[in-house]
Amino acid sequence: MAKTTGIAPGMLRGVHHIALNVQDMQASCHFYGTVLGLHRLVGDEVPSTLVKLVAEGKVTNFKTPDGTILDLFWEPELSPPDPNPEKSFTRADHLAFDIAPDQMKSAIALLKQADIPFKGPITRPTGQGIYFKDPDGFTIEVRCDPQC
């Protein structure tokens, strides 16, 4: 079998969500909701898999105009960001790409063929994901909905 270079073109359906760990949820909600004007998800808009965490105040969800979800995860024990902008990337958690549930096994096989180390699949209430690093060390998630 020929070695592939990664996940096949067209397999990724788009960015599913962006997750950020935040130290001050109130300040972050003000920034993303008021300053940037993103729509805060409330009530039935909150993904069913996150309702409990939202109710507990541990997660707040916003939606960008193109439909991408921004998840803010409250992590009050985070150390302050480095004042040097070139060193402050550690507060971003991961970038998640959505795939169809029937493509998870293929994505895993392609990562193995490309010799890309990964963790998973990990099943959570929000779905199933595999995690690996990009060349700069950012965590990338390829995920599908809970039925995968």
Model regions and ranges:
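Vicinal oxygen chelate
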Residues: 1-11, 15-23, 58-65, 82-148
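A short, acidic/glycine-rich surface segment
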Residues: 2-5, 45-50, 77-83, 118
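Short consensus segments that form the blades of beta-propeller domains
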Residues: 9, 51-52, 86
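Core segments of cupin and vicinal oxygen chelate
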Residues: 21-69
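Conserved beta-strand in the GNAT
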Residues: 70-73, 141
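Acetyl-CoA-dependent GNAT
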Residues: 74-79, 145
